[in-house]
């Protein structure tokens, strides 16, 4: 069996081949389809190949995977932590990868299937267009700020806002900068609409999107972004694995007999997914329900910013439960879910249709009824947390936990059972 490491670059890849009982063989191949197919023809089912995740990794992996018995894509950050070296060349890197794979030390990356890769490209393409639009809008805002001008409209880039901008009296150079920004915005807005239309058509056919959109604050963009990053939910055995994968788990530092120190979130994984989760959390806490109650509880102790991050983490836990069970969020407001669905249909180009919802209640009455139910759930959450806190305080005062056991002290710290009791376990399963 041969073990082959590839250090991949834009135009070439350095190859190191390990064979039992022989010196390593080295070669360089071009990263063109023809050269890669010729290299793949020299491989067999007894070979195993490793390469690091880069921009062109997936195309190379797709060409080689059918010819070898085992192909691994490694995580560059974790590989560097395992095999950092003073001498770093392409040949050394390729050989190091092969040696790590032979020793079974490679931290692998999941190789997404073609539909997931296509969704990732579509989501990242839309995100890039949105960033371009934001830059253009910020340039126009900068012109107004430099000239001490306040816009009289709430939507500066709507029809009324653009008409006001075109008539605004400014110095010639500043006026031309605003006009150029508006001219550039038009095609970018059109491309964003087309990209969102294509994404919406795929989202309507994906039942996972409907499940995630049942969560308050989670729209189609957030749902698609999460699905693109997650792929198959079966990859994650429990919610904590998904939280860690998205970089919302806290950093932990512990050495010797010192207690563990928990710091800020790790920020590993997909930054775009964390961004849309934070945006969704800001929206979710404005809707009555257990999520808003949870936000208020954390905000009172840790401040608003940390509370928003805690809600984002809770959204990830909810995502794991909903996708694993195939069930919508229990406290999903039906009217809000229908509104999200209709917005998705409009983006996909589906014409409006008149539907009649059963019952004698008007739309406003249904919304008020749903709001009352959610406010009741929010109040029930607060009562649950308050009752558990009272039990924890009583247990701490008597020196016994909820099961009547006297806790064992370890170096001045309470036992895990008492720590669990003192925390109160305020979060309920996958519901908040």
How should these model regions be labeled?
Residues 1-432:
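A detector of single, family-specific signature residues
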């Amino acid at each position: 069996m041969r073990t082959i490491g590839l250090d991949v670059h834009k135009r070439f890849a350095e190859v190191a081949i390990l064979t039992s009982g022989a010196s390593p063989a080295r070669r360089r191949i071009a990263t063109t389809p023809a050269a890669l197919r010729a290299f793949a023809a020299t491989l067999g089912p007894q070979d195993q190949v490793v390469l690091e995740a880069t921009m062109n990794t997936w195309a190379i992996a797709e060409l080689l995977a059918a010819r070898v018995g085992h192909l691994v894509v490694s995580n560059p950050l974790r590989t560097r932590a395992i095999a950092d070296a003073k001498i770093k060349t392409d040949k050394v890197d390729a050989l190091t990868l092969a040696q790590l794979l032979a020793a079974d030390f490679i931290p692998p990356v999941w190789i997404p299937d073609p539909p997931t890769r296509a969704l990732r490209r579509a989501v990242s393409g839309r995100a890039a267009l949105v960033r371009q639009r934001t830059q253009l809008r910020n340039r126009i805002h900068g012109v107004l700020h430099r000239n001490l001008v306040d816009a009289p409209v709430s939507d500066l880039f709507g029809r009324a806002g653009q008409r006001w901008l075109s008539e605004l009296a400014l110095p010639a150079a500043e006026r031309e900068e605003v006009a150029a920004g508006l001219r550039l915005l038009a095609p970018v807005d059109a491309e964003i609409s087309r990209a969102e239309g294509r994404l919406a058509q795929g989202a309507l056919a994906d039942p996972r999107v409907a499940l995630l959109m049942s969560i308050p604050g989670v729209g189609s963009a957030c749902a698609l972004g999460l699905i693109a990053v997650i792929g198959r939910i079966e990859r994650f055995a429990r919610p904590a694995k998904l939280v860690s994968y998205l970089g919302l788990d806290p950093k932990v530092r512990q050495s010797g007999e010192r207690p563990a120190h928990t710091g800020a979130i790790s920020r590993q994984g997909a930054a775009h997914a964390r961004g849309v989760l934070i945006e969704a959390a800001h929206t979710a806490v404005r809707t009555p329900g257990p999520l808003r109650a949870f936000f208020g509880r954390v905000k009172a102790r840790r401040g608003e910013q940390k509370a928003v991050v805690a809600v984002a983490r809770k959204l990830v836990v909810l995502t794991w439960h909903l996708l694993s069970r195939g069930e919508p969020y229990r406290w999903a407001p039906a009217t809000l879910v229908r509104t999200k669905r209709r917005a998705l249909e409009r983006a996909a180009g589906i014409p409006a249709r008149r539907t009649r919802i059963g019952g004698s209640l008007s739309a406003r009455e249904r919304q008020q009824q749903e709001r009352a139910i959610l406010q009741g759930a929010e109040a029930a959450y607060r009562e649950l947390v308050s009752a558990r806190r009272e039990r924890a305080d009583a247990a701490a005062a008597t020196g016994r936990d909820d099961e009547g056991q006297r806790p064992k002290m370890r170096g001045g710290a309470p036992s895990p059972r008492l720590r669990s009791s003192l925390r109160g376990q305020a979060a309920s399963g996958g519901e908040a």
